[in-house]
Amino acid sequence: MNQSSTKHTKVLILGSGPAGYTAAVYAARAMLKPILVHGIQPGGQMTITTDVENYPGYAEVIQGPWLMDQMKEQAKAVGTELIEDHIKSVDLSKNPFKAIGDSGKVYTADSLIISTGAQARWLNLKS
């Protein structure tokens, strides 16, 4: 793989839900120039959550997609680089850590934050 297909950062964040964007904001504010890699649908499960009633700072109910848009814009505003790619493998055996995307791009990082969230695994039971 040639040098142009490798991108290095101090902090690489995988996942664009609330945890990923929060990590990105704090890393950017610490001048670490983070890169956040997100999939096709950024925002995680919060993008399909209608009413969010337990987020600090909001006395009224807010909408999940709106909150994720706000978090994304804040992460960008403080200097986070957002990249759309799907990470298919990571190598944590040595530093710098390495993540390989479906795009063929190789991401290397001194620190790696994996915040890929959760996915429901439905039981095959009748209701």
Model-found features: residue ranges?
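Beta1-alpha1 glycine-rich phosphate/pyrophosphate-binding loop at the start
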Residues: Q3-V78
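FAD-binding core/adjacent interface of flavoenzyme oxidoreductases
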Residues: M1-L14, A30, I35, L82-S127
